[in-house]
Amino acid sequence: MVRIPRRKLLPSCLCMTATVFLMVTVQVLVELGKFERKKFKNSDLQDGQKDVEGDPKHLNPLPKKDALALSGRNKVDAGSYPIVLWWSPLTGETGRLGQCGADACFFTINRTFQHHPMTKAFLFYGTDFNIDSLPLPRKAHHDWALFHEESPKNNYKLFHKPVITLFNHTATFSRHSDLPLTTQYLESVEVLKSLRYLVPLQSKNNLRQKLAPLVYVQSDCDPPSDRDSYVRELMAYIEVDSYGECLQNKHLPQQLKNPASMDADAFYRVLAQYKFILAFENAVCDDYITEKFWRPLKLGVVPVYYGSPTIADWLPSNRSAILVSEFSHPRELASFIRRLDYDDGLYETYVEWKLKGEISNQRLLTALREREWGVQDINQDNYIDTFECMVCRRVWANRRLQEQGLPPKQWKADVSHLHCPEPTLFAFSSPASPALRGRSLRELWLPSFQQSKKEAQALRWLVDRNQNFSSEEFWALVFKDSF
């Protein structure tokens, strides 16, 4: 059976995916078709469900590990292999016996296996995790595992202690996760060092006659990070070319306006002409680092970064990015960027690591060297395969302990596996874009985050009761004054 990894597909890819899904079942085609179109069809310029930062184009389309397709969806001999059930239909696999080193597990999205005696673990995709249907009652030997590499705005309740601690195993953007995905948008050390897109400084200086020093490309406006408010204020002090729908003042060439072109060589070369790229995440979370940060580094452009408070731990060198958090106001940031724009020697200190091909950050080098998955590498498993195998191996480890008469090991996630503070506005924030019909960011994201706390508490109470529940029960509990 063909291994179908999850990716945010563009319309042309959707057709190919749909064809493969038809080989599985019509039911899976409909279900996944809705799932993909809802969450993954949009622009590389957009965030969360719309953005390339949640776009795992780096998934390996041809998994490395062995997979044995089973002819019958339910033909698994009880007592033979542990069953690992994707409760979120992420992979589209109705049945696959996957080899994970010396261990093997049966992976499936078929929910009829929920009560099978050999079902040992349930896998959830964070964005798709909801209260409408959960595998309850949960038996003592049922592990829950969470895969969530995307923005917190996709599902805030996961980021609160009552919910994250429901899971035994995690794969998230946090370095503290069981399977850290912090470098999910960075292919390799070699890509960082590559000079393929580097435009010489003298050429950039000449291009400054028609280009601003800074470029901003976003089409998901007014996200929880309040980035558009900051950039809007920054524009009052320094020129910024903005190509996306947010604060747009410049247009891309017609052939690059299609979202499919956002990973195109021609688009990269447009960005590479600039001295600085505004690399602002859609949310502020520890270790939540997307292509917005890595892309300018690949292109030989200095990122002006706002997002993860822990970004300093992941810089290629101490002087490779300008951190917005180090400036008290956009006015000060603009003044500093103008200094670098006019002083070639000072500017070059920020690209010296690139020119010399020297990455001094040992944490980054170690993370890339030791991670068990690859990005756009046909010789390595993708991170979904690796996540599945991590759970499979842990299931087998406990099975062996029990065979020896020993108690099974208990794994449990904690709040460090997904940490994001509540959204905050910049002091100079102005009303949101017309797209939000006059609502401010505070009116949208902060109440959403605060309500998610109550949702997390309600969900935990219902899950601990260990009975199926309706959405009506859940929402009644969320809005109960005394809860």
UniProtKB/Swiss-Prot annotation:
It is a single-pass type II membrane protein. It is found in: Endoplasmic reticulum membrane. GO terms for cellular component: endoplasmic reticulum; endoplasmic reticulum membrane; Golgi membrane. Pfam families: Glyco_tran_10_N, Glyco_transf_10. Its main location: endoplasmic reticulum. Residues 32-483 are lumenal. SUPFAM superfamilies: UDP-Glycosyltransferase/glycogen phosphorylase. The keyword Disulfide bond applies. Disulfide bonds join C389-C392. GO terms for biological process: cerebral cortex radially oriented cell migration; fucosylation; N-glycan fucosylation; neuroblast migration; neuronal stem cell division; neuronal stem cell population maintenance; oligosaccharide biosynthetic process; positive regulation of protein secretion. Protein O-fucosyltransferase that specifically catalyzes O-fucosylation of serine or threonine residues in EMI domains of target proteins, such as MMRN1, MMRN2 and EMID1. Attaches fucose through an O-glycosidic linkage. O-fucosylation of EMI domain-containing proteins may be required for facilitating protein folding and secretion. May also show alpha-(1,3)-fucosyltransferase activity toward the innermost N-acetyl glucosamine (GlcNAc) residue in biantennary N-glycan acceptors. However, this was tested with a library of synthetic substrates and this activity is unsure in vivo. Belongs to the glycosyltransferase 10 family. This is GDP-fucose protein O-fucosyltransferase 3.
